[in-house]
């Protein structure tokens, strides 16, 4: 796997005639996605709008997004990776065990029909959400989607894009990527970046209780992460920078109120297709910006002398 084949949301609006949502519920989580970019808008190469597009929804249960889809495929929980690898095998003309496919909750004929539709599309796109990336398989599921899309380009134009959560999640990934070469799951503990999802990912580090402190900026893991991770955050010195009270700030040792980016502080957010959007403040705030707080913390850390915990102190030779 050598990266992702992607595009902007504007290209999706103007070109995509075959749209797949996998492991997401955009009707609730991204209610304007359908009307602005994917289903209903009329594009340059899709002049009929909704009539010229086909939408497929893949999920483990029926959600409000089902009523907007043309095809709904209900996969058994934890079987997304098997479905993706089956689609890749069918794309390459490899033999597939029908009994194994049935374990995913889908018939082989259904997947054969899907892969043929994908190959015949003029411009296809897969939007994949946390129902795929945060279930069994995690980053391997994402890798399977990226590989499938790359291989589909031997037949037609196909792209993919993660459907991100709230806040500037894409921005954090983009900055991490151009500064370290990796988008997430990065450890700098040795003085240089190391990438290993599953080991250095935030959830995994917290669940294993590998860290003894936490600094959280503009996020609320206390509302979304597994309970073992939340319990660990509550048991260690946790510092939260956030303009409002959240589940995480309630369990933190320190909560520093900061100015709201885009309202009281300038900044840049990245859309889910990685397009940067500059933000200008419109109101004044008595609170410092996130950048100011981090800069002051960094200055104080620089003033501290080098130290080692007592457990790491050198033992004198006998």
Question: Where are the model-predicted features located?
Answer:
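Non-catalytic alpha/beta scaffold blocks inside enzyme catalytic domains
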Residues: 1-155, 179-318
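Short, conserved secondary-structure transition motifs
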Residues: 156-177
């Amino acid at each position: 796997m050598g990266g992702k084949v992607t595009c902007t949301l504007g290209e999706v609006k103007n070109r995509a005639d075959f749209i797949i949502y996998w492991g997401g519920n955009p009707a609730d989580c991204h209610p304007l996605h359908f009307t602005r970019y994917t289903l209903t808008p009329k594009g340059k190469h899709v002049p009929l709008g909704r009539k010229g597009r086909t939408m497929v929804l893949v999920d483990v249960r029926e959600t409000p997004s089902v009523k907007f889809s043309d095809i709904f495929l209900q996969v058994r929980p934890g079987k997304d990776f098997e479905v993706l690898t089956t689609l890749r095998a069918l794309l390459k003309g490899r033999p597939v065990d029908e009994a194994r496919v049935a374990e995913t909750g889908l018939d082989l004929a259904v997947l054969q029909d899907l892969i043929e539709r994908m190959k015949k599309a003029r411009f296809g796109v897969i939007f994949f959400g946390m129902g795929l990336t945060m279930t069994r398989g995690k980053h391997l599921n994402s890798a399977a989607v990226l590989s499938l899309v790359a291989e589909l380009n031997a037949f037609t134009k196909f792209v993919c894009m993660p459907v991100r959560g709230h806040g500037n999640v894409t921005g954090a990934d983009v900055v991490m990527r151009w500064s370290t070469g990796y988008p997430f799951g990065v450890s700098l503990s040795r003085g240089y970046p190391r990438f290993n999802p599953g080991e250095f990912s935030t959830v995994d580090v917290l669940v294993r209780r590998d860290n003894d402190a936490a600094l959280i900026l503009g996020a609320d893991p206390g509302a979304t992460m597994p309970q073992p991770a939340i319990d660990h955050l509550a048991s260690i010195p946790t510092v939260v920078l956030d303009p409002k009270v959240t589940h995480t700030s309630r369990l933190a040792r320190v909560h520093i109120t900061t100015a709201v980016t885009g309202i009281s502080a300038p900044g840049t957010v990245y859309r889910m297709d990685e397009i940067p959007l500059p933000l200008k403040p419109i109101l004044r705030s008595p609170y410092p910006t996130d950048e100011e707080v981090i800069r002051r913390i960094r200055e104080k850390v620089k003033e501290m002398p080098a130290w080692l915990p007592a457990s790491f102190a050198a033992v004198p030779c006998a």
